[in-house]
Amino acid sequence: MKTRVEAYVKEGCALCEEAMEIISSVHEDMPFNLKKIDITSSEDIFRRYHASVPTIFINGVKSFKFKVDGEEFTKKVRMEIIKAKVRRISSKKLQYK
């Protein structure tokens, strides 16, 4: 399964735009599923994140809030990709035993 990145953002938010630029740049070089969620699309989502955008989740784990560091984001995504590959290899080895 591909690594999932969910970005909770709001239009007109400078930090959100900066975060999406970093995430998009990394996405060009690394395979992961990216879902950009506008917090104004749902009242529930808006209530949860209106005071903390951008909020970035990697594989369901809150990884960044307000500021996304490009190097740290790259490391975290790379680590999740490696873990997924190891799980795939391990499951294949178990199938052949």
Predicted region positions:
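Secretory/periplasmic and organellar redox-cofactor proteins
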Residues: 84-97
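Non-catalytic, surface beta->alpha helical segment in thiol-disulfide oxidoreductase systems
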Residues: 61-87
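Generic recognition of short, well-ordered alpha-helical segments
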Residues: 17-21, 47-48, 68
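A generic structural signal for alpha->beta connector loops
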Residues: 4, 29-33
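Local sequence-structure signature of Cys/Sec-based thiol-disulfide redox active-site neighborhoods
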Residues: 1-25
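Thiol-based oxidoreductase modules, predominantly thioredoxin-like and allied folds used
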Residues: 32-43, 50
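A short, hydrophobic beta-strand/beta-hairpin element that forms part of a small beta-sheet core
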Residues: 53-63
